[in-house]
Amino acid sequence: MTRPSVSTFKAPKGTYDLLPPDSAKFLAVREAIAAPLRNSGYGYIETPGFENVELFARGVGESTDIVTKEMYVFETKGGDRLALRPETTAPVLRAVLEANLHKAGNLPVKVWYSGSQYRYERPQKGRYRHFSQVGAEAIGAEDPALDAELIILADQSYRALGLQDFRILLNSLGDQECRPVYRAALQDFLRGLDLDEETLRRAEINPLRVLDDKRPDVQKQLTEAPLLRDYLCDACKAYHEEVRELITAAGVVFEDDPKLVRGLDYYTRTTFEFVHDGLGSQSAVGGGGRYDGLSEMIGGPSLPSVGWALGVDRTVLALEAEGIELDIPSATSVFAVPLGEEARRILFAKVTELRKNGVAADFSYGGKGLKAAMKAANRSGARYTLVLGERDLAEGVVQLKDMESGEQTAIGVNEIVAELESRLG
């Protein structure tokens, strides 16, 4: 049998490979989102890329598109039914419960994560079957200040990246006291509309999901739909107003969106979304909200919680839409070019020493000639290049070239590390 060549294989439909130099931009976005979280008491958490199917069926909601249409589900040889994670909030809560972190006496448990999610969706720009998110969860406390904190931190992340053209949409979904009354009123309204059979079925299971339907013909019929804010109980009204006051006092601009719902069933009270108008139909770059009942839905105790997830892929698209170029330092500061075997041995040792001292250094591999090696040095983005030839060896020096100014200086071989550390600060 003839083995296929490597070029026969391509990334699966709806996925992409993240390659240098573009990957540096994605790493910078992840770091910009994570930095304010680390500065605010959030510890890093990592969960498996797959979980028990029932975790998502119970937590995300059996009637959601994610569970019914979009999950990658498989059965192990041992008979376990698992799913690649379509989102990470339910897995994070599962991990916290399993490790009994909620019993350590220091609530809320504040954690952040970064990782891949998988959904079988129709691929288009900004919507992939494999995508990356950075998320944050504050588990075990019912406090408007926590909701406000997370919204403020996400806003801070985007501002740090230089983004300006994003909007924050805010709403309250009520709680177990007032939402059932609204649910019944919304169902009565939806039954009187000209909706397809699938949408009517969804309206009976979870009518709030119909409000999230993006089809123009459905949205047109929803213009007179009852609004949840008119059904909020006094406690939910007071809670939501405090969230609004706290983020306003922090200088965060937001828009009240009474029809905002999220695509996951576990949200209660505060819900919010970050949208960017430069992304077309896939305008949401992130979102989240409060999920006070999720712990009980997956078999745990009552643990009111709040969190969000921001899409790394869509944030990068938002940066491109605004024409923002991130100031990403070169991955290499020094590039070494040996000309000959003895020079190769000496410079390789110096590059190793530079790296041990924290200097980002690379080496011309493959026995390239001077011209090809200098092209590689240029491509690396290195500030300085070290060139060591036979004449230099005889004199005990190396040529140090400043790639910005073009200035070239001969320095002693034994002075390389100290000289470069001094120049690079």
UniProtKB/Swiss-Prot annotation:
Its EC number is 6.1.1.21. Its main location: cytoplasm. GO terms for molecular function: ATP binding; histidine-tRNA ligase activity. It is an enzyme of class 6 (ligase). One of its GO terms (biological process) is histidyl-tRNA aminoacylation. GO terms for cellular component: cytoplasm. Keywords: Aminoacyl-tRNA synthetase, ATP-binding, Cytoplasm, Ligase, Nucleotide-binding, Protein biosynthesis. It comes from the Bacteria. The keyword Membrane does not apply. It catalyses: tRNA(His) + L-histidine + ATP = L-histidyl-tRNA(His) + AMP + diphosphate + H(+). InterPro entries: aa-tRNA-synth_II, aa-tRNA-synth_II/BPL/LPL, Anticodon-bd, Anticodon-bd_dom_sf, His-tRNA-ligase, HisRS-like_core, HisRS/HisZ, HisRS_anticodon. It is found in: Cytoplasm. HAMAP family: His_tRNA_synth. Homodimer. Belongs to the class-II aminoacyl-tRNA synthetase family. This is Histidine--tRNA ligase. It comes from Streptomyces coelicolor (strain ATCC BAA-471 / A3(2) / M145).
